[in-house]
């Protein structure tokens, strides 16, 4: 294993402050950085020696021997304090400190467990539920207790039968915990989509789930809560899917409990390395992930590493970019256009993508439900675009293709195409799946 690099900002809020110095010996569970504001403790994920400390990161040279033993966090009568002490953050999204989220009084409301595994091709959340459903459910109960929630709902796609069966068995004697089945449509894991699907409440783009007396918590986060309370384990591990053009094959290979801060290259070594020429390496999912480098460190929020096939060469073709809140921002879309060797002649935004505040990422007005994009497509055609590069959800992609390709003769490329072709997944074009899901669980 190469050097471990622990970024001091891998959560929502302010960067943490390092409390170690070069030359210090550390173990798994050694506290190495503490919050300076909104944030979460950071612990060493390996046995080793601190090599470098900067304003951005702590670099650790791991020992050759890595015992499983870790330094436990302090025991407390307060479960919430143990969650805060463990440094847990949201492990499926932006990394909001879990101790802060669970401290909100839901007044008898809901914990919504996000098990959608929203990004295509990833499997680490589902594998966790298949293998550790009972402990995950105990984590849900702890979250309910800390948040004063009376009910909990697992939001999971109907296609994941084995995981659904495992959850169903684990909650058989728990009437306050239920399962809501989701369609296999992107972005069903967006937190406002989870609230809408589970509770029938459409929040405004500026509203948090707490407005519906709910907290949306990623299923891995829930498991780490159980580990903190039952095992006094600090947040030092992350479950990661490695996907794409690697020697192990394009299907997702899941690695549980990888040390936070392990490099992308070390993770790729675990699958035999990159298989020949490639387009880019993405940290995160096909929709919301960003290009990364081999020496980049993983964090508490890293869910996937994807290696793609090379990009097609558009030979300078004129393209319009349709930026959506569901996918990459304008900078990411321009990056993709450049990698396709295309000339950007127009940039517009999905009509559902609401600007909440200047400079902040846009929010979808109603995630996964599209009212039509004809005006946006026409705008790009008038600007001279021959191709459209889009980052839309399943439903919006369907409407763009219908009006752009069939009615206006434009060629459509989805920002995820190079990933989907790599993993042999259907391209995002036409919506062929119903958005309504039968909630009958008798077959599971």
Model-derived features: where do they sit?
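Structural motif
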Residues: 112-114, 216, 389
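Hydrophobic alpha-helical positions that pack around
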Residues: 159-264, 270-276, 285, 296
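Gly-rich Lys/Arg/Thr-decorated short loops/hinges at beta-loop-alpha junctions or inter-strand turns
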Residues: 111-125, 248, 354-359
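Short gly/pro/ser/thr-enriched loop/turn and capping motifs at secondary-structure boundaries
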Residues: 118-120, 186-189, 353-354, 419-422
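Iron-sulfur (Fe-S) cluster-binding modules
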Residues: 1-90, 100, 108, 144-159, ...
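Short, glycine-rich nucleotide/cofactor-binding loops
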Residues: 123-134, 325-327, 367
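Histidine-anchored nucleotide/phosphate-binding helix
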Residues: 130-146
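Conserved alpha/beta core surface patches that mediate binding of polyanionic ligands
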Residues: 89-109, 123-126
């Amino acid at each position: 294993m190469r050097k471990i690099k622990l970024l001091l900002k891998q959560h929502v809020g302010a960067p943490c402050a390092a409390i170690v110095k070069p030359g210090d010996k550390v173990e798994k569970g050694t506290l190495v950085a503490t919050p300076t504001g909104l944030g979460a403790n950071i612990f060493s994920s390996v046995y080793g020696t601190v090599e470098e400390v900067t304003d951005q990161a702590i670099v650790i040279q791991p020992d050759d021997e890595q015992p499983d033993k870790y330094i436990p966090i302090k025991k407390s009568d307060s479960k919430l304090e143990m969650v805060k002490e463990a440094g847990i953050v949201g492990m499926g999204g932006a990394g909001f400190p879990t101790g802060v989220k669970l401290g909100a009084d839901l007044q008898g409301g809901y914990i919504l467990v996000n098990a959608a595994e929203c990004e295509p091709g990833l499997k680490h959340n589902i594998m966790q539920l298949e293998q550790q459903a009972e402990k995950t459910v105990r984590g849900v109960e702890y979250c309910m207790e800390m948040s004063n929630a009376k009910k909990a709902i697992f939001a999971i796609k109907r296609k994941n039968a084995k995981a659904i069966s495992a959850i169903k068995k684990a909650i058989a004697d728990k009437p306050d915990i239920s399962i809501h089945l989701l369609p296999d449509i992107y972005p069903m894991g967006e937190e406002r989509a989870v609230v809408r699907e589970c509770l029938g409440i459409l929040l405004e783009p500026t509203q948090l789930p707490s407005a519906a007396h709910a907290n949306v918590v990623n299923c891995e986060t829930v498991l780490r809560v159980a580990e903190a309370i039952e095992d006094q384990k600090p947040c030092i591990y992350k479950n990661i899917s490695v996907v794409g053009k690697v020697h192990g094959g394009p299907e997702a290979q899941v690695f549980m409990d990888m040390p936070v801060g392990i490099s992308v290259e070390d993770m790729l070594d675990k699958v035999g390395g990159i298989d020949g020429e490639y387009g880019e390496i993405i940290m995160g999912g096909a929709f919301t992930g960003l290009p990364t480098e081999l020496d980049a460190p993983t964090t508490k929020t890293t869910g996937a590493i994807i290696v793609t096939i090379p990009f097609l060469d558009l030979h300078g073709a004129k393209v319009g970019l349709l930026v959506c809140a569901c996918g990459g921002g304008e900078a990411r879309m321009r990056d993709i256009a450049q990698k396709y060797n295309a000339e950007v002649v127009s940039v517009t935004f999905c009509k559902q993508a609401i600007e909440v505040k200047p400079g902040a990422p846009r929010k979808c007005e109603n995630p996964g439900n599209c009212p039509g994009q004809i005006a946006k497509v026409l705008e790009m055609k008038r600007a001279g675009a021959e191709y459209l590069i889009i980052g839309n959800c399943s439903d919006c992609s369907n409407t763009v293709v219908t009006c752009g390709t069939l009615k206006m003769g434009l060629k459509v490329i989805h920002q995820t195409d190079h990933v989907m072709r790599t993993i042999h997944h259907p391209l995002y074009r036409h919506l062929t799946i119903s958005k309504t899901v039968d909630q009958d669980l008798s077959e599971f």
